[in-house]
Amino acid sequence: MARDEDLGALFARVTRRLIEAERPLLAARGLSMWAYVALTRLVEGPAPTQIALAEQMGYDKTRLIAILDRLADEGLVERTPDPEDRRARIVQLTAAGRARHLQARSDIRTMESEMLDGLSDTEQAMLREMLGRLASAAG
């Protein structure tokens, strides 16, 4: 057991394992990790602009354009001109994007359940709650 291990080291080990497990699940759905993150943010509602979406994701705005281009080409997102700023684009999830995200999230939740099999349902819920609070506090 790693009771004395620093939180950063513990998070790094778990994060690495989660990413290794998620990557093939997302690839099977035709998504990269960052494309999935973008869809996840858009499930919460349309992004006021592409720049705002990049900020919400903590991702480089210039690199996000290529991801959004691909998602738009696949019909998963729509970008429309911002009526208040012709240079800006509003990003919205399409029904196909919502469905693809739901499929990917279901795959990930199944994997997470298997990974957390050693924890009770209550412990799993507590872990998710605490991690959510930590993530919110971190920004």
Regions found by a protein language model. Give the residues of each.
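N-terminal leader segment of winged-helix/HTH proteins
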Residues: 1-29, 117
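Hydrophobic structural patches
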Residues: 11, 39-42, 131
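N-terminal helix-turn-helix DNA-binding core of bacterial DNA-binding proteins
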Residues: 16, 20-63
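Charged, amphipathic alpha-helical coiled-coil/dimerization segments
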Residues: 19, 47, 51, 69-132
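Conserved alpha-helix in the HATPase_c
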Residues: 66
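Short, charged, intrinsically disordered terminal tails
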Residues: 136-139
